[in-house]
A protein has these predicted regions:
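Short, intrinsically disordered terminal tails adjacent to the first/last structured region
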Residues: 1-5
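N-terminal membrane topogenic signal
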Residues: 7-23
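Hydrophobic alpha-helical transmembrane segments
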Residues: 17-22, 46, 72-76, 134
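Membrane-embedded alpha-helical segments of integral membrane proteins
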Residues: 28-124
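Internal/C-terminal transmembrane anchor helices
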Residues: 125-152
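Alpha-helical transmembrane signal-anchor/signal-peptide segments
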Residues: 150-163
Length: 163
């Protein structure tokens, strides 16, 4: 007795995007918008932005419904890309914030890149969807190669300039 094999693949459930979109929207609001209206909350905004980044990573790994190779691959790509980017950014960015400036500022941008690419490519086939995530992550890291910092302002903000 044999089991009949069919060529029909089981349809994949679509990506669950709403938790990632909400996490990134909250992250950017806490990171950039709230400190504009309440300047004393700047350090809290940084911490909240990093916590929301953790929420995006947890969503992507456990709740996104993406194939496991895409889930792990995207996280590994982000880590490798930001470590590689640190080698080519201006020394003021690489050494700023006791060497943590790039990592702290990269978290919101990488989260936005991941969620935006996942949302834009969620109806595409595997190859184009992966290419969109790779392109978005590399673009997000590439932005930092165009910047330098003059230090920290009196309000505690980074003084970014174009290279």
């Amino acid at each position: 007795m044999t089991i009949a094999q069919t060529d029909e693949s089981t349809p994949r459930k679509p990506l669950r995007l709403w938790p990632g979109v909400i996490a990134v929207a909250l992250q950017w609001r806490l990171w950039f918008v709230v400190p504009v209206f309440f300047p004393e909350t700047g350090p809290h905004g940084i911490f909240a932005g990093l916590c929301a980044g953790l929420a995006v990573v947890l969503w992507w790994l456990f709740f996104s419904r993406a194939p496991w190779s895409d889930r792990v691959g995207a996280i590994v790509l982000m880590v490798v890309a930001i470590v590689a980017t640190k080698r080519v950014v201006h020394e003021s960015i690489a050494g700023g914030g006791m060497g943590m400036l790039l990592y702290i500022y990269a978290v919101p941008l990488l989260c936005l890149a991941l969620v935006a690419a996942a949302a834009a490519g969620h109806r595409r086939s595997t190859g184009p969807r992966r290419a969109m995530v790779i392109g978005a992550v590399l673009f997000a890291c590439g932005v930092f190669t165009l910047l330098r910092t003059g230090g920290i302002t009196g309000e505690g903000d980074s003084d970014f300039h174009w290279r």
